[in-house]
Each structure stands twice: as structure tokens, then as C-alpha cells.
Swiss-Prot record:
This is Phosphatidylserine decarboxylase proenzyme 3. The active site is at D442 (charge relay system), H498 (charge relay system), S586 (charge relay system), S586 (schiff-base intermediate with substrate). Residues 15-31 have a biased composition (Basic residues). It is a lipid-anchor. Binds 1 pyruvoyl group covalently per subunit. It is found in: Endoplasmic reticulum membrane. The record marks G585, S586 as: Cleavage (non-hydrolytic). It is an enzyme of class 4 (lyase). The C2 domains have an essential, but non-catalytic function. They may facilitate interactions with other proteins and are required for lipid transport function. Expressed in roots, leaves, stems and flowers. It comes from Arabidopsis thaliana (Mouse-ear cress). It catalyses: a 1,2-diacyl-sn-glycero-3-phospho-L-serine + H(+) = a 1,2-diacyl-sn-glycero-3-phosphoethanolamine + CO2. Residues 22-147 form the C2 domain. The gene is PSD3.
Length: 635
């Protein structure tokens, strides 16, 4: 279901998977004749449960809902989303829609299925979702067919229906054999199931590798294990397996022409999908997120008239009307909700020279006054009336089941906005290891090993600098060439921030300033310097593992106050609460000293694409570099 499994359950599944994969390897050894170098090397290859790769055929059979409507189902997997057809008006929609999904090494395995009630003119509304780990289907019995999953209300985790799916995962041996059959069929002109030398030569040419094309005779002899002058399916499979591991011979897909990476199994699976998309009722693809896939035709028309586009990365102009981030847990793309009127006003102010002139002519004061008035309004008893509409707008992004108190506990909107979570809702990674830093907030995160990387990939303000960020009252020399992590909190996020490291709070430094938005539209603008001009508080934390860490809490539009629950001299453990932001979006920036932290590779890779990563408090951020004085030379 994707709602968290126990360690025992995960280990049990992983143990079963290892056994099954060992069986795959045994079958490979038994099915390939001879003891020559090619087959011998092929049998030595290993596939582990951690880097399993294959093809999953996922079929959305139907659902049982609690009321009648016309229903639409979307499958989000990694950076792709697919949608079914819209059903008839019924409580029991039937789709029978299928899609082959690529299970890559170290890639996503969690698929999210979202069910929407459709609306002809307005946007479609999500009613329920379920999550399933496709690796679970690797260990199921071959006769397993349809499985039922509870559909959960995204706002409360209540069960709102049932989803019926089937899934089969093609094992590596089967993928290898089927791939060889499809490859062979391209040039098997006489359709005898074997390749002559001339047919084999044409195949090498189709692979787009000049070196391999010049070694056709040598490769043909290596493939023809029994010396009968032709290459069979098994012999071709063995050759492709070994050569892709030793010296790749496939540079481009012979079907679509796309250049392929060196990973042999992923390249093979890519080509298999190109050969055979399946014969059933196929889901429609080409979407990044389930929200994009679920839009009705009128909404699509409005998107077209505004010339806005969907894409990941650093977007400006009309492309900035959608913010797409990647969920670290599920490895799928998620669209961040933001009102279109707000988008247009932010673009006008922050991404134009006219907006810059407005800033110089009093707009800063207007934003300041607006934020103060809004802060007072959100502290009034009347503001509690806004909570239900706020929850409805962010229906699939706020889970009230995690909140410590029920909804009627909150007497003002700000009380709800700074809500606490239940104990254990945010587990802290490696709690007993102080050399592991963790995420400071539920946020959209950008991480850079150096400040230069941050200005190249993300921060476009012309005057951004560490000295400007930390101000004159903080000794910034140690941080100048350090690592930078940006935690951007959207309005729907849990707005309490926590310590990313264990240490002692040395001091607090308040820096007055403006209240620009911290939305990427402003951060990516070359016309203003959000982080160095906004109101902020700098906390210096002294640690044994990371040296000094500068924790910068930055206010933003509508954020009238930054509150702290700790004092100078307090010792904090990583994951301990430091404070909270009142209503609005806001940001925390952590600056580490140079060479003090090795940030996790997935966070750096996403940030290099200008793609924010959706994380929660306590997720691992990175580990400290070993200090030279602590190293012991072995004799």
C-alpha cells in the first residue's frame, strides 16, 4: 500500500526476492550450453535484489467507489505518468488499461495510482490513491492474478474505495531471451530463427557501433559456440550479455534510434519496450504528473492560451506557471499547487524590469505592510473559517492523520498553520550517529556542494553571496567556499523547522530586511536578491562532526514572524525542533564549512538539473567528511 512497512516485512520480501533471483541465475547456468568463454562469463554475472532490473506489466482492472461518477485513473511512476480512459458513470468503473513500466537498477519501484472524479469543464478532483511497490510482484506466485488495494483519501487516510490491479514482472532471464528474439527478428530475413553471417553483419550495423561493425567476423565466431555457421537465439543472447558488459556493441536503439547509455540491462529493457508496447488497452502517456494527466479539456485549453508548459528544472516566463518537484521517497514527479493569479503577479514583479522599478518605488513597503496585516488577520478567531477551504485546495498534499490535534482544536488559522505532528510521524535517520546530517524541514530541497554550484544551477540574483546572506555580525570566512542547502517551505507544508545536526547553539543574529516571496519565480530572477535582502535570523550551531553550521531562517511574503523555541547555549540533537514560521511560504538555508559534509548524491543530482527534491524532516542529508586529526594510519 505504500504506507510504510515494518523492517521485518521489508527483510522478508528482500529475502524472498534474493531466493528467486538466485533461481534465475541457476536457470541461466543450466540453459546455456558449453563451457566456452562467452557462456562462462555470462553465467558469472550476478543480479542482486538491490539493483534488480526488468519490465513490469501493470494492468488497472477497475475499482469500487462509494458513489457514482465518471472515473479516471492515473499511474505515476518515476518521472512519468499515464492515464486510463474515462469510465461510464458508475460506482464500479472498469478500465482494463495496461502499461509496461521499466524497473531500472537503483530506479523507482513505487507506483502511485490516483483515482479522479471527472468534471467536463473544471479540473478533475482526486478522490483516492494507493501505492504499490512493483518489486513485491517479483516474489509472487506465477498464478497470482488480480489484487485489491485500499484507496485512501489523500487528506485523511480514510478508505474511500478499492482498486483492482494485476502486475507481472518479467525476470532478467526471460527479458534477455525475449530481447534476443526481437533483435534477431529485425534481420532474420528468411525467418528460420537463426542468423547467417550476412544477417549478423546487418544487425551489427544497426547497432550504430563503428568498432563492432569492423569486428563482425570476430564477434560472429565468438557467438557461434557450436561452429555450425549460424547464430541461434541462445547464442545471440549470450553474446549480447557478455559484450555489453565487456565492450558494449549497442550504441543506439535499432527501433527508435535513441542513443543508449552503457548500462547493459537498462539498454536491453529500453529496446524491449520499443519492440513491444503490448496488445491490450494501453494507457495514455506523455505526462509528468498525475495532476497534469487528469486535467479536463477546458483546463487544457486555458493552459494552451497562456502558452505555459510543463517541464522540470529552472523555468522562467510562462513556463514558471507550474512548479514540478521530485518526491524523494517515491522518486516520482509531483506538481506543486499555486494559484494562477498569484503566479501571474509574481512573474510581473520578479521577472521583469518594470517590476524591479516598482520595488525601488515603494513596493517593498507595500509587501511589508501586507504581510503585517495578513499576520494579524490570521491570528484572529474569524480566520479559523479559512481552514476548511485551505485543506480542500491542498487536499492531496496535507495528511491530517499525521497532525497531533484534531481540526476543532485550532482556534485561529495561524494555530493550524504552525500545527504540531504526532510523535514518530517524522523518523530521524541514523539517530545515534551524529556524523549524519538530516533534513531540517518538510520542504522542497536544493543542495549544492559549493556556493558556485548554487549560483550556476539555481540562485540567479546578481548579488548573492555567503557574506551577504550571513550579514556583518557573523564571521563568514569559514563558510565562504562551503556547502549550501536550501529548504523551501510551501504554504501546505508542516511549518516547524528542526536542527539538521547535533551541537550547541552559539548565538542568534537577527537581520532586518524585505519580505519578498521565496517562490522559485523570485529566486530564479536576476532582478532581485531574495535571500540576501529578506528579513532573516541566523543561528550558529557548533558541532563536533561538521564544525560550525549556519542555520538561516528567512521570512517571506505573508510571513510576519519567525519564532524560536531554543536559546543560546542550548544543546540540540538532530531532529529537535528549533522554531516555526507563521502564515506564508518561507525558507531555511544551511551553510556548512568547506569540506565538512558530503551531501547525498541523489540530492546533488536533482539540484544539478535545477529540480527541487520533496523531502520530510529527518531524512538523511549527508555525512561528515572524516577529519584528518581523527584518522589513524595503519602500519
Amino acid at each position: 500500500m505504500g504506507n510504510g512497512n515494518s523492517t521485518e516485512t521489508k527483510e522478508s520480501r528482500r529475502s524472498k526476492m534474493r531466493k528467486k533471483i538466485q533461481n534465475f541465475r541457476s536457470r541461466r547456468r543450466l540453459s546455456r550450453p558449453g563451457s566456452g568463454s562467452v557462456s562462462g562469463l555470462a553465467s558469472q554475472r550476478s543480479v542482486s535484489a538491490d539493483d534488480f532490473a526488468g519490465i513490469a506489466l501493470l494492468t488497472l482492472i477497475g475499482a469500487e467507489m462509494k458513489f457514482k461518477d465518471k472515473w479516471l485513473a492515473c499511474v505515476s511512476f518515476g518521472e512519468q505518468t499515464f492515464r486510463s480512459e474515462i469510465s461510464d458513470s458508475t460506482e464500479k468503473p472498469i478500465w482494463n488499461s495496461e502499461k509496461k513500466l521499466l524497473l531500472e537498477k537503483n530506479g523507482p519501484s513505487l507506483a502511485r495510482i490516483s483515482v479522479f472524479e471527472t468534471n467536463r469543464l473544471l479540473k478533475n478532483n482526486i478522490v483516492g490513491y494507493c501505492e504499490l511497490d512493483l518489486l513485491d510482484f517479483v516474489v509472487q506466485e506465477p498464478d497470482s492474478t488480480c489484487k485489491s488495494f485500499d484507496l485512501l483519501d489523500p487528506a485523511s487516510s480514510n478508505v474511500v474505495g478499492s482498486m483492482f490491479v494485476s502486475c507481472s514482472v518479467e525476470d532478467p532471464v526471460e527479458t534477455e531471451t525475449c530481447f534476443a528474439k526481437r533483435i534477431l527478428s529485425i534481420v532474420d530475413y528468411d525467418e528460420d530463427g537463426k542468423l547467417s553471417f550476412s544477417e549478423f553483419s546487418d544487425l551489427m550495423n544497426a547497432f550504430g557501433n563503428v568498432v563492432a561493425a569492423n569486428k563482425k567476423e570476430e564477434l560472429f565466431k565468438a557467438a557461434d559456440l557450436n561452429g555450425d555457421g549460424v547464430v541461434t537465439i541462445d547464442e545471440l543472447a549470450a553474446l549480447l550479455a557478455v559484450q555489453q558488459e565487456q565492450e558494449p556493441i549497442i550504441n543506439s536503439c535499432p527501433v527508435c534510434g535513441e542513443a543508449l547509455q552503457l548500462d547493459k540491462l537498462n539498454a536491453m529493457i529500453h529496446m524491449t519496450l520499443c519492440f513491444d508496447e503490448g496488445t491490450g488497452n494501453q494507457m495514455t502517456g506523455g505526462f509528468l504528473t498525475d495532476r497534469q494527466a487528469s486535467y479536463g479539456w477546458m483546463f487544457k485549453l486555458s493552459e494552451w492560451t497562456h502558452l505555459s508548459t510543463y517541464d522540470v528544472g529552472l523555468n522562467t516566463g510562462s513556463s514558471a506557471s507550474h512548479i514540478v518537484v521530485i518526491d524523494r521517497k517515491t522518486k516520482r514527479l509531483v506538481e506543486e499547487l499555486i494559484d494562477s493569479k498569484i503566479v501571474m503577479s509574481m512573474r510581473a514583479i520578479y521577472q521583469s524590469k518594470i517590476g524591479l522599478r516598482l520595488m525601488d518605488q515603494g513596493a517593498k513597503e507595500i509587501l511589508q505592510n501586507l504581510s503585517e496585516k495578513q499576520g494579524k488577520k490570521m491570528n484572529s478567531v474569524e480566520s479559523a473559517q479559512n481552514i476548511p477551504s485551505f485543506l480542500e485546495f491542498f487536499k492531496d498534499q496535507i495528511n491530517m492523520a499525521e497532525v497531533k490535534y484534531p481540526l476543532d482544536h485550532f482556534k485561529t488559522f495561524n494555530e493550524f498553520f504552525v500545527r504540531e505532528l504526532k510523535p514518530g510521524a517524522r523518523p530521524i535517520a541514523c539517530m545515534d550517529q551524529d556524523d549524519v546530517a538530516v533534513s531540517a524541514a518538510d520542504c522542497r530541497l536544493m543542495a549544492f556542494q559549493s556556493v558556485d554550484d548554487s549560483t550556476r544551477f539555481w540562485i540567479k540574483g546578481r548579488k548573492f553571496s555567503i557574506k551577504g546572506l550571513l550579514g556583518n555580525d557573523v564571521q563568514s570566512d569559514a563558510f565562504l567556499d562551503g556547502s549550501l542547502v536550501i529548504f523551501r517551505l510551501a504554504p501546505q507544508d508542516y511549518h516547524r523547522f528542526h536542527s539538521p545536526v547535533s551541537g550547541v547553539i552559539e548565538k542568534f543574529v537577527n537581520v532586518s530586511g524585505s519580505l519578498y516571496t521565496v517562490n522559485p519565480i523570485a529566486v530564479n530572477s536576476k532582478y532581485c536578491n531574495v535571500f540576501t535582502e529578506n528579513k532573516r535570523t541566523i543561528v550558529i550551531i557548533s558541532t563536533a562532526e561538521f564544525g560550525k553550521v549556519a542555520f538561516v531562517a528567512i521570512g517571506a511574503t505573508m510571513v510576519g514572524s519567525i519564532s524560536f523555541v531554543r536559546q543560546e547555549g542550548d544543546h540540540v540533537k538532530k531532529g529537535d525542533e528549533l522554531g516555526y514560521f507563521s502564515f506564508g511560504g518561507s525558507t531555511v538555508i544551511c551553510v556548512f564549512e568547506k569540506d565538512s559534509i558530503k551531501i547525498d548524491e541523489d540530492l546533488l543530482a536533482n539540484s544539478a538539473r535545477s529540480l527541487e527534491t520533496l523531502v520530510t524532516v529527518g531524512m538523511q542529508l549527508g555525512v561528515s567528511f572524516p577529519k584528518l586529526e581523527n584518522c589513524v594510519l595503519e602500519p
